Amino acid sequence: MNRPQADKFMGPIGNHSLFFCGFHAAKQNPEFQVTTMHYCGMRGEGDYEMHQCVLYDSVSPGAKLLGIEYIVSDKVFRSLPDEEKKYWHPHTYEVLSGGLVAPVMSDEAEIDFMTYLLTTWGKSFHTWPDPTTAVPLGEPLLMWSQTGDGQADMELVRERDRRFGVSTAETRAVRVKAIGYQVPQVPPPRSVTTIGRQWTAKGEDTPAPLKKSRLPELGRGQRLGTARG
């Protein structure tokens, strides 16, 4: 019997060619943080275009599979009921602060991709809650993002910067200038039922521009993976 080629069945995995790195915090305990490698692929079209990501604790062949994340546009997020919105974290601060990096992209491609991510939202659960354990233990954790200065574990940031040869501080300066908005300062969620905010702690949740700029088109997709250099 002729057996089909193995790659015929690898479509879902082969689509996850977009890589970036960031930091996830447990929503119920924002001080618990994990450096998280995102391997993402696109699905859907138009308003319902989204990224599906598998998450690992490192880039090594033996990396631990931490969990999953779905990424949708601001338009999709705002269409969700409040009961659902509590699961979705903003990416705005992570982008402008340099918390998210895509080290295999060229500088130009990375700016384009981060501009796209700026107003998106992610829903992430870590099914391996504590990556220091030998096997996954306990219930899955709903994960969150840093949303203001002083929230990130700086030792994790320094270790990530050393690993990939990047500077979060320099990346922040470049992003703010290129994208044209001030870095937002939103406190951590008060509880697991708190609905996230992108730009402000209260009032109208809108950005403070540094200069005339425009937000990326909602729902616009990026299929980027250009090698740096």
Regions found by a protein language model. Give the residues of each.
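N-terminal domain-onset segments
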Residues: 1-50, 113-229
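An exposed acidic His-Trp-rich patch
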Residues: 59-150
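Short, surface-exposed beta-edge/turn micro-motifs
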Residues: 50-52, 65
